[in-house]
A protein has these predicted regions:
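N-terminal intrinsically disordered/low-complexity leader segments
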Residues: 1-11
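Amphipathic, non-transmembrane alpha-helical scaffold segments
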Residues: 9, 17, 63, 67, ...
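Helix-turn-helix
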Residues: 15, 19-57, 61
Length: 201
């Protein structure tokens, strides 16, 4: 195998995905043509189908790549030494507020932007969204459980149910931020989150 060729091919694919994430994170999936992505990526138009079978397959890969990176970032945050889980969870939601800007999220709000749009358009993209969001909720649930065990958190109900409620709260806040064009929904979500978690002082 020619490792140089393989590496170059992977680099081109990654460039297309990163460019698509940035553009579609701002404009949505349906509104963006492949030519716009490829031109911005500096990739010849005829080479797209060497990497992706269709625009739908590209969208599925886009979401899979997005969630892989997102979940890895969550894992790094929740493995930070010397921090109680309450601190780590607070840092996670504070980072959410900072990254999901209504002005320009630079592709970091892809799940929010594409969630409602593609769920009814593509079964494979909906499955990628379902799998990715399940991974987020699972990590939140494990962090909540660990917080209860280390004594930094106190909450009612199961960690799984609370994790799902918190994710839905913040997903809704992300949509409202885009509607009202200010950060107030995030401020409310963070206040509600802290009330639900009863962090130890």
């Amino acid at each position: 195998m020619n490792t140089t060729t393989t590496s170059s091919s992977t680099d081109v694919r990654d460039t297309i995905l990163a460019t698509g994430q940035r553009i579609m994170g701002a404009k949505g999936f349906s509104a963006v043509g492949l030519n716009e992505v490829l031109t911005a990526a500096g990739v010849p138009k005829g080479s797209f189908y060497h990497y992706f079978a269709s625009k739908e397959a590209f969208g599925e890969a886009l979401l899979a790549d997005y969630f892989t990176t997102y979940l890895a970032d969550m894992d790094r945050l929740f493995r930070q030494p010397g921090q109680a889980k309450a601190q780590q969870l607070d840092a996670y939601f504070s980072a959410w507020q900072e990254s999901q800007s209504f002005e320009d999220c630079q592709g970091k709000c892809l799940a929010v932007k594409l969630g409602a749009e593609v769920a009814d358009l593509s079964a494979s993209m909906r499955a990628a969204l379902k799998h990715g969001t399940a991974g987020i909720i699972d990590r939140l649930a494990r962090a909540l459980q660990a917080g209860a065990e280390d004594g930094s958190l106190s909450f009612t109900g199961t960690p799984e149910a609370l994790a799902q409620s918190l994710y839905q709260l913040w997903l809704g806040a992300s949509i409202m931020v885009k509607i009202v064009r200010n950060a107030q929904p995030f401020d409310t979500a963070l206040h509600t989150t802290r009330q639900l978690l009863h962090p130890s002082r």
